[in-house]
């Protein structure tokens, strides 16, 4: 498997340290089989992925956005999904949350849409609480 990456601030050295090859934004969209988005929402990232980027993707490619909805232009994504220009999308972030009942993402057969709470589980919260208590004890022991 080849891991490619792009970021406005990434250096070739940082990509290599992460086990990836730095490519241009255009190359990322043209080459990726599975494209995952891991960015914070800011004025620089809002609308970063629009129709031009999505239309560069392979028809067999899949997009995963678990960052923030407005990073991907929602109407452009709906368009490429409806037209089967990409194989599918997995998303748990949307322009409007909760996702309205009539939203197209709910009916497209090439969309996996979930709430942005996929990490929530009993085991995870147990770990959070145990780690918190452990950290407090360690701090108290040294002060």
Where are these regions (language model features)?
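Residues at the starts of beta-strands that form the adenosine-phosphate
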Residues: 1-2
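The conserved SAM/SAH-binding core of class I Rossmann-like methyltransferase domains
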Residues: 6
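Rossmann-like adenosine-cofactor binding region
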Residues: 9-104
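C-terminal helix-to-coil terminal segments
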Residues: 95-143
């Amino acid at each position: 498997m080849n891991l490619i990456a792009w970021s406005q601030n990434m250096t070739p050295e940082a990509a290599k340290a992460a086990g990836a090859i730095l490519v241009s934004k255009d190359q990322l969209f043209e080459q990726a089989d599975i494209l995952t988005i891991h960015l914070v929402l800011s004025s620089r990232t809002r609308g970063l992925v629009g129709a031009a980027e999505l239309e560069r993707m392979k028809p067999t490619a899949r997009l995963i956005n678990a960052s923030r909805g407005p990073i991907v232009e929602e109407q452009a994504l709906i368009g490429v999904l409806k037209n089967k220009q990409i194989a599918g999308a997995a998303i748990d972030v949307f322009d409007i949350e909760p996702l309205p009942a009539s939203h197209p993402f709910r009916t497209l057969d090439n969309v996996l849409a979930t709430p942005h709470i996929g990490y929530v589980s009993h085991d995870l919260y147990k770990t959070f609480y145990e780690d918190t208590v452990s950290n407090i004890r360690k701090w108290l022991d040294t002060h």
